[in-house]
């Protein structure tokens, strides 16, 4: 199987992570390859893939792109709301900061709302991450480890695990 112990956790956990990651990736693409939302939401956006297909989806407006992004993130937030309750015995639930977890969803919502010019919602979601996330800033002396490629568990909301990232540079 693709995921060991896939039936040990509810479908909502996997779907929540997948929706959050889909929104995160589309958000990065739209920021890189489309106009600025606050300047012209009606401007051309990117194709937003909501299902697997060999055909490229139609290009949409920025407003429609952001509508999809926010909808995916809000659904992911609802699906991941109980993620702390899933202790499980498998490796899947270890190191939640390398999964697209509830805090990653909320941090991304804060970024999306800020990019859309909605400071009130951006502040609301940023505050949720700060107050519920148990994150703290690292001391100055610990920053050296970050430069050496060591993950800061205190400050990491989300990251993608890539074994050998720093040793496979050529």
What are these regions (language model features)?
Residues 1-20, 27-170:
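Structured, solvent-exposed acidic/aromatic patches
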């Amino acid at each position: 199987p693709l995921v060991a112990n896939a039936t040990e956790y509810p479908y909502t956990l996997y779907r929540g992570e997948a929706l959050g990651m889909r929104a995160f990736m589309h958000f990065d693409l739209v920021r890189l390859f489309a106009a600025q939302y606050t300047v012209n939401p009606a401007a051309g956006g990117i194709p937003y893939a909501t299902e697997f297909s060999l055909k490229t989806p139609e290009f949409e407006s920025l407003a429609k792109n952001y509508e999809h992004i926010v909808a995916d993130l809000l659904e992911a937030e609802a699906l991941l709301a109980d993620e702390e309750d899933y202790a499980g015995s498998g490796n899947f639930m270890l190191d939640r900061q390398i999964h697209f977890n509830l805090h990653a969803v909320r941090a991304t919502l804060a970024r999306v709302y800020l990019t859309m010019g909605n400071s009130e919602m951006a502040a609301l979601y940023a505050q949720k991450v700060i107050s519920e996330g148990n994150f703290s800033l690292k001391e100055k002396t610990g920053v050296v480890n970050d430069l050496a490629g060591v993950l800061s568990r205190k400050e990491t909301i989300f990251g993608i695990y890539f074994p050998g990232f720093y040793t496979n540079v050529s």
